[in-house]
């Protein structure tokens, strides 16, 4: 809601369900016949409205509500394309067991096919107003990342604490993280050179005018990408992780998206993914 309110954007709330009857044992149906009742979209739409209304008080434009029957990731992407949306927001409410794996599967399929920014939001651990004081932005030095970083700055910085579209105040931290693979970590002389070069590139990544908005902090670590991203995010108490999903080849895309999926599943703060292709 914070993003929608700041930009006075149109919010569309989408709920996807499957009307097909699952395989339920006959004795279970006999004990709970309501399981066989057909789903009524109008009633479900009313339920969605009632569920969401308490969270919509900050909106300047009335929200639109949609209920669709079908495959969850397919319907999400199809509606996003139909409505020409700028951002998809998904809640990662399932934190354990099979539900967590299923949620990861849905999120990964949306990331793979949406080709637009996706914000994955975990269960709320605080009720205070949302501010972005510490943003973690992993950088892989891909040729498309300057555009992704520009997008991050234009979209996220207006929501940082003490910053508004009309009043820029410095203070928020933008942590630029580059993770060096384990191979270099095991070769100290190579890691030292790579670390030095990476630090210089990170320092040059943020445009000069953006430094009036935030405090860029370059950081280089060694290890597996998703593990290091989650570790640094937890260490800093990050309010947001921003990742570019890129790679020209199919293998590169799969590798980076698998990293992104693991970060989404393990993060305790929202994760914004940007399609930088």
Where on the chain are the PLM-derived regions?
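Active-site phosphate/pyrophosphate- and oxyanion-stabilizing loops and adjacent acidic/basic residues
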Residues: 1, 53, 108, 150, ...
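Small/aliphatic-rich secondary-structure junction motif
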Residues: 1-33, 133-193, 208-211, 215-219, ...
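Structural beta-alpha unit
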Residues: 2-8, 12, 18-21, 36-39, ...
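Gly/Ser-rich helix-loop-strand patches that form or flank binding pockets
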Residues: 6, 77-128, 231-277
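Short, hinge-like loop/turn segments at secondary-structure boundaries
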Residues: 28-32, 82-83, 106-107, 136-138, ...
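A short acidic, glycine-rich active-site loop
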Residues: 31-46, 190-200
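Well-ordered alpha-helical segments embedded in enzymatic catalytic cores
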Residues: 75, 148-151, 201, 228
